[in-house]
Amino acid sequence: LASEDIGNADPQALVVATAAAQAVERVGMPESQIILSQAAAYMACAPKSNAAGNAIFAAMDSVKRTRTTVPVHLQDAHYGGHEKLGHGIGYKYAHDYPNHYVKQQYLPDEIRGEKFYELSDMGYEKKLKEHMKFIKDHAD
């Protein structure tokens, strides 16, 4: 429930669920009824989003449908001779740019333009969506 139905609309839901499971293991029943009730109430009241689940399923489907290769500028460049293969050439390190974001191609040519993670307007995902819009609007 915490990941499948709530996801990043409330990222704390997974923390609450994990903490509740650990507490139940340590405390035992019948005292754990209150722990479980608290966690269940939190999950019931949390904003919901299945965007993260949809994203991984869409990405896995894309991998099954399309044979791709990693863009050459993203390929490993931590060995001698990588330059001859073009590996790492032209790579832009995001943390060297404003807002730690840089426009560059990350997806293989074969699936360039596909979008897997569609943020919702629910809970924290709305803030993530606004953040992504801001950094893209202000990228070099």
Regions picked out by a protein language model, each given a short descriptive name:
Residues 1-101, 108-140:
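Terminal-proximal interaction/regulatory segments of ATP-powered molecular machines
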